[in-house]
């Protein structure tokens, strides 16, 4: 019996460095279509030739503190399997890059994902960077940075499910193809809202456990979830990741959305920090840093140009 995977363990395998090849080119096709605290390091020396970006909005001078779940948080931020005292992940690298431009140190602050917004509003850190999505409810209490990654929702089914025979990751599929099925996703995920739009779909939410094991065990019919998570856990994209032969991604990613950095709207410091972070992200988009990070984590695709990443 395969143990259940919680959100953090689940995320631990999604989108790291390139080089893996899935039979039939599935990984390459998919990526082309998609979209206690551990010391985080991060130097304080600004990038040569670049005017340092302001850091007046920080809670603690010299320290850029961002909330995230690292326990099982791959590919976003998680302990390096070969050195658990060191964090890795694409958002970890983005945090370091922003801090370097600002001449400060980046520090991830551990917090449970389900309590992340409450911690942000209690000013436990400067901002949230954890695959954070903009929603109408969050916009009531949060400010948001410009988008730093564009992704789509991905359908996953059992590889031997005859109902989806002939369906590949290049098929044009959507919500209507899930009607009549029980579909799993993570609680508080964007996919949960999307599935809720169609009353002919039975949605099963997972918190803290996540749906891949239940899918493999025939307890649900499909999963709908962020593309980067599927790339890591199902397709095996990234160092240390392993493809799951019992499952397959079908259909092109749809309902594209973006990841943002969130700030507490009621905190006066956030009014200062948000434009500083936006300035840093703008530099990282134009100088190739973000593209380099996403290439390393097998997350680069043409959709990133739509949000200004070069």
Annotate each PLM feature.
Residues 1-12, 16-34:
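N-terminal secretory signal peptides
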Residues 114-115, 132-140, 196-197, 221-256:
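A ligand-binding cleft/hinge motif common to bilobed small-molecule-binding domains
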């Amino acid at each position: 019996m395969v143990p259940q995977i919680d959100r953090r363990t689940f995320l631990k395998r999604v989108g790291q460095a390139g080089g893996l090849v899935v039979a039939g080119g599935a990984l390459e096709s998919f990526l082309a279509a998609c979209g206690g605290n551990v010391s985080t390091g991060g130097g304080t020396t600004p990038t040569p030739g670049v005017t340092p970006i302001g850091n007046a909005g920080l809670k603690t001078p010299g320290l850029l503190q961002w909330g995230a779940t690292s326990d099982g948080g791959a590919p976003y931020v998680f302990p390096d399997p070969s050195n658990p005292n060191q964090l890795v992940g694409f958002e970890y690298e983005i945090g370091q890059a922003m801090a370097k431009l600002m001449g400060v140190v980046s520090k991830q602050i551990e917090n449970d994902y389900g309590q992340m917004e409450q911690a942000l509003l209690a000013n436990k850190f400067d901002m949230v960077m954890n695959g954070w999505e903009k929603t109408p409810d969050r916009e009531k209490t949060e400010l948001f940075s410009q988008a730093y990654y564009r992704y789509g929702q991905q359908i996953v089914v059992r590889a031997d499910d005859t109902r989806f025979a002939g369906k590949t990751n290049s098929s044009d599929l959507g919500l209507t193809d899930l009607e009549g099925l029980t579909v799993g996703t993570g609680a508080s995920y964007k996919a949960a809202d999307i599935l809720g739009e169609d009353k002919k779909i039975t949605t099963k939410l997972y918190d803290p456990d996540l749906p891949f094991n239940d899918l493999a065990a025939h307890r649900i019919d499909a999963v709908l979830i962020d593309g980067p998570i599927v790339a890591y856990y199902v397709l095996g994209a990234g160092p240390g990741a392993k493809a799951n032969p019992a499952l397959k991604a079908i259909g092109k990613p749809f309902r594209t959305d973006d990841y943002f950095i969130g700030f507490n709207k009621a905190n006066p410091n956030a009014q200062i920090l948000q434009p500083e972070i936006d300035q840093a992200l703008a530099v990282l988009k134009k100088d190739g840093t973000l593209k380099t990070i996403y290439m390393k984590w097998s997350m680069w695709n043409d959709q990133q140009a739509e949000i200004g990443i070069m």
